[in-house]
Amino acid sequence: MNSELSAPASVNTCRLLSLDGGGAKGFHTLGVLKEIEAMCGCPLYQTFDLIFGTSTGAIIAALLALGSSVDDIHTLYKEHVPVVMRQRTASGKSRALAHLAKTVFGNRKFADLKTGVGMQQAV
């Protein structure tokens, strides 16, 4: 038996990046993504066919799929996460996040995405 595996003539692949949630833990995710982006040598939306995220990971996924660099997202997080996390109530955090979403995403549409994106809200 030949131990060398040969790839089929036509290979259907889907390169998936999955990002977890966890509020301010998004900074850890961004640190890992910075290394992946450096290893790939190109924006992550060019590397992955689908970027999927939960909670803060969904925010990062959407921004990556729109073409933002990891550095740009990290800057955004440094500026805005403390404001959101300072809110003492869930409704206060929700209001702060809604305001941030309007500021960051504005009138962007799904047609603006440069790669596939999936999002899941944590319950």
Segments (PLM) and residue ranges:
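Short hydrophobic segments within beta-strands
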Residues: L19-D20, Q120
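Flexible, membrane-associating and regulatory peripheral segments of lipid-active enzymes
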Residues: M1-A9
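A short alpha-helix-loop-beta-strand transition element characteristic
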Residues: G106-G116
